Each structure stands twice: as structure tokens, then as C-alpha cells.
UniProtKB/Swiss-Prot annotation:
UniProt-recorded name of the protein: V-type ATP synthase beta chain
InterPro entries registered for this protein in UniProt: ATP-synt_VA_C, ATPase_a/bsu_AS, ATPase_F1/V1/A1_a/bsu_N, ATPase_F1/V1/A1_a/bsu_nucl-bd, P-loop_NTPase, V-ATPase_su_B/beta
SUPFAM superfamilies named among the record's database cross-references: C-terminal domain of alpha and beta subunits of F1 ATP synthase, P-loop containing nucleoside triphosphate hydrolases
Pfam families: ATP-synt_ab, ATP-synt_ab_N, ATP-synt_VA_C
One Gene Ontology molecular-function label: ATP binding
Family per record: Belongs to the ATPase alpha/beta chains family.
GO BP field: proton motive force-driven plasma membrane ATP synthesis
UniProt source species: Anaeromyxobacter dehalogenans (strain 2CP-C)
Function: Produces ATP from ADP in the presence of a proton gradient across the membrane. The V-type beta chain is a regulatory subunit.
Keywords: ATP synthesis, Hydrogen ion transport, Ion transport, Transport
Taxonomy of the source species: Bacteria, Pseudomonadati, Myxococcota, Myxococcia, Myxococcales
Length: 475
């Protein structure tokens, strides 16, 4: 046994993705392990796998194997502890590449020549070095850009129900997202637990839109081991940090689906026989998610930014489920998809009332988008909330029994959903979104627009009221 690597012949046993060893001196948590095993079937060549030390006790250790353990014979395995932590070779040349969940080429091309090999378990940004998030990222989606603006350095999750087009929305944002002013921009996309149909659709969408050259894609498939799923977002963020803070790019990281990640975390925790917490998830899931989300931000004195848009599916459509509940505590808002809007054929089915971007004020307004951005958004919110209340009342008393003001609000709510929110797969600039909002508001007298300063109302040309109350789509 040398000073750099330690080799052990034979293991105690295997339980799922875990390999147990005893008599291993100086093992460290997170240490990379190489496993050379002989399958049970005779006559086959030995296979080599990799793993990571995840638990230590006085006389034994547990290793998470990154590949399939089926057919691995513990007694005939040779385990090498390398003394190294998991690292990823990163480079600007990763742009345009499709990688697996561990950062290995999945597009048939050779690995990129690394410029550095940082550890994938990076720390959150130092709070004393953080720069306040500012300036917005244009996604081309009106319900986000206009009503819940995404700011550079922010972490803004998308909460979806099972069966809603969250993956389609994620792909659309990857294809459409940009920053204003010609600054360098890139997207890092990480899919976790994706079935073949889904990840194939992602790649086809990126290629068709011509955005693959400024995108790095990490694909963890549904059939891949759960431990790989736990490393995929960390590999993606390690790559994004290099692009953002070494090369000065503004990087948007899209992670989907965080629920698959949490399910893998629970599966591995149960295999380690840990005491489960709420609904079987480990008690440290909050801390684990924080190690992912808190890597977003900006660094004082350095160009570039790292923005996160994680997508998660709420089990049983439950906002209080541990996954969305804990995610909401860590992140800075949420974009909520609605099953009711989806049933009505509205795409993207974003419900703007429970949605929120807590940092919108840092990326919207004078010098960032337009002077009228916040006032128009606030007025649209106010009328839409009242229109939703009227809709519930109309379901009881009937629309024919509503007053003129209530009918106007009801028509506004329909037009808002069908036109402003339900834009389909088209791209809208922030100017297009705000002009669409003004057309909706033109159906109300100026005295009713209490959220908009008078100077902005005087600066607007007169518009026909029919566009706001017709209930149809907005051009």
C-alpha cells in the first residue's frame, strides 16, 4: 500500500449502489474510489467502475458506486482509494457539447481539453464577496419578463404539477434567453432522470433553434444510477462557475427536474439506513439543496454572473410538499404552473398570482427595462386579481347578472390569460410584453389606472378600448 493510493482486495458486501469495506486507513469523505471487479459469470473480462466515499465509521466505510453494481462480486473486487475528491475538467470549449451526468462526452466527440479541474462540490459564494443581483435576463416569456422578471445572479425556480409542459417551457427558455447590450451569454442545461423521449426532445429543440453552440448540456438519463443524478447538478454548476467567473460570461443554469434529484437523494439515504425525515426524505435535504442553489450569484470585482432556473414537479400538486417547500425557503421567488390554465389550452400555463420574483425590483425599471415596467405590471396584477374574484362570483350568480364593471374585469382576466400569458411558443421582447399590457389596460378609463403615475398616462397615445375587452389573443 503506497502513500498516494491504497488498494484493498475484497469487500464486505453490496447493497444497491453501496459497496462496504473494512480495514481502510485514512479514508476521507468524498474521496474518489476505483473499483475493479470480476462479474459473477465466469469467462468475462474484469470491469472497472468508480465511486465515492460517503460514510465512515471506526472500522468500515461505505462507497457509492457511480455505475451499475449488478453482477459485481464483492469478494473478488479490488478497490483503490485515490486520495482525490471528485473533479471536473472545465473549459470554454465545453460550449456546444453534450455530456452525460458526470461530464463525460455523450456526443461521440473527444473530451474537451481542460483549462482547470476544480472539485465539483464547490462552496457557496462568500457572502462578503457577493455583488447584489442586477439587470435582467430576457427569457422571451411575457409572464416571466413582464410580471416576474428574472435578474442576473438570481435563483428563481419553476413549480410544476405532474403532466404540465414544464419541460417544454424549460427548453423554450434555453432557446430564447438572452441578455441585453451584447454582453457574452451562455446557458448550462442539466437534465436529471430524463427518459429517452424527453432528453431527445431537448436536444432536437436546441439544435432546431441553433443555440447549441452557446449551450452546455448535461444529460442524466432515467436508467442511470441515482448517485450520478446527485452529481449532475454539481458538475453543471462547476462548469457554469468556470464560464461565469473565469471567462466573464453571464450564465443561465437550467436544472430539470429537481424532484428527480430529491428522489435519488432519498433512495441513497435509505440505502445507507439513515433515519428518514418528512415523507421519507433525509433530514439534511434542506442543506443539500442549499449547496446547489446558493452557488448562484455575482462576485464583486469580477465580470459575469450565474443565474439559476431550477424546474421541479410538485408531488400530488402540493405546494407544501417538502421539495417545493424547502426550495421556496432557499430561492428568491417561484414561477407556478397552473393545471387549470393548462386545461384551458393556455401555454405557458403560468399562474402569475402565486408566482413571485423577489428581486424583480433590481432588474426592472429605469435604466434596466423601461420606466413603465413596474407600474404596468402592478396594474395588470391588480386588475387580474379582481377579475379572478369576479370569475368565481360569476360561477355562482351567472355572468348575465354582473354589473358593467364586473363584466369588464371578467373580460380583462380572459384576455390577460389568453393573450398576454398564453403566447404559445413565440418569442416576445420586453417591449412587446409591455405594449401588450398597455393594450389590455386601454379598456379602462384613466381614472381606474391607479397604479400608473399620471406622467406615464399623459405620455401614452390614445388606444382603442376594444383590444382590452375582447377576450381574444394579443398580437
Amino acid at each position: 500500500m503506497d502513500l498516494v493510493t491504497r488498494r484493498i482486495r475484497g469487500a464486505l458486501g453490496i447493497a444497491g449502489p453501496l459497496l462496504f469495506l473494512e480495514g481502510v486507513p485514512r479514508a476521507r469523505l468524498g474521496e474518489v474510489v476505483r473499483i475493479r471487479g470480476e462479474p459473477e459469470a465466469s469467462g468475462r473480462a474484469a470491469e472497472e467502475r468508480s465511486g465515492q466515499v460517503i460514510a465512515l465509521s471506526r472500522d468500515r466505510i461505505a462507497v457509492q458506486v457511480l455505475e451499475e453494481t449488478r453482477g459485481l462480486a464483492p469478494a473478488r473486487s479490488e478497490v483503490t482509494l485515490t486520495g482525490q475528491v471528485a473533479r471536473l475538467g472545465v473549459a470554454r470549449g465545453m460550449l456546444g457539447r453534450v455530456l452525460d451526468g458526470l461530464g463525460r462526452p455523450a456526443d461521440g466527440l473527444p473530451p474537451p481539453v481542460p483549462e482547470a479541474r476544480p472539485a465539483i462540490h464547490g462552496a457557496a459564494l462568500n457572502v462578503t464577496r457577493r455583488e447584489k443581483p442586477s439587470d435582467f435576463i430576457e427569457t422571451g416569456v411575457s409572464a416571466i419578463d413582464g410580471m416576474n422578471t428574472l435578474v442576473r445572479g438570481q435563483k428563481l425556480p419553476v413549480f410544476s404539477c405532474a403532466g404540465l409542459p414544464a419541460s417544454r417551457l424549460a427548453a423554450q427558455i434555453v432557446c430564447q434567453a438572452r441578455v441585453r447590450g451584447g454582453e457574452p451569454f451562455a446557458v448550462v442545461f442539466a437534465a436529471m432522470g430524463s427518459p429517452f423521449r424527453e432528453y431527445h426532445a431537448f436536444l432536437e429543440a436546441f439544435r432546431a433553434a441553433g443555440v447549441l453552440d452557446r449551450t452546455v448540456v448535461f444529460l442524466n438519463r432515467a436508467e442511470d444510477p441515482p448517485i450520478e443524478r446527485l452529481m449532475t447538478p454539481r458538475c453543471a454548476l462547476t462548469c457554469a462557475e468556470h464560464l461565469a467567473f473565469t471567462h466573464g460570461l453571464h450564465v443561465l443554469v437550467v436544472l430539470t427536474d429537481v424532484t428527480s434529484y430529491c428522489e435519488a437523494l432519498r433512495e441513497v439515504a435509505l440505502a445507507r439506513e439513515e433515519v428518514p425525515g418528512r415523507r421519507g426524505y433525509p433530514g439534511y435535504m434542506y442543506t443539500d439543496l442549499a449547496t446547489i442553489f446558493e452557488r448562484a450569484g455575482r462576485v464583486r470585482g469580477r465580470p459575469g454572473s450565474l443565474t439559476q432556473l431550477p424546474v421541479l414537479t410538485m408531488p400530488d400538486d402540493d405546494l407544501t410538499h417538502p421539495i417545493p417547500d424547502l426550495t421556496g425557503y432557499i430561492t428568491e421567488g417561484q414561477i407556478v404552473l397552473s393545471r387549470d390554465l393548462d386545461r384551458r389550452g393556455v401555454y405557458p400555463p403560468i399562474d402569475v398570482l402565486p408566482s413571485l420574483s423577489r428581486l424583480m425590483g433590481l432588474g426592472a425599471g429605469p435604466g434596466k427595462t423601461r420606466d413603465d415596467h413596474r407600474p404596468v405590471a402592478d396594474q395588470l396584477y391588480a386588475f387580474y386579481a379582481r377579475g379572478r374574484d369576479v370569475r368565481r362570483m360569476a360561477a355562482i350568480v351567472g355572468a348575465a347578472n354582473l354589473g358593467e364593471e364586473e363584466k369588464r374585469l371578467l373580460a380583462f382576466a380572459d384576455a390577460f390569460e389568453d393573450g398576454l400569458v398564453g403566447q404559445g411558443g413565440t418569442f416576445r421582447t420586453i417591449e412587446d410584453t409591455l405594449e401588450a399590457g398597455w393594450r389590455l389596460l386601454s379598456g379602462f378609463p384613466p381614472a381606474a389606472l391607479t397604479r400608473i403615475p399620471e406622467r406615464l398616462l399623459r405620455a401614452r397615445p390614445a388606444q382603442p378600448a376594444a383590444a382590452a375587452t375582447s377576450g381574444g389573443a394579443i398580437a
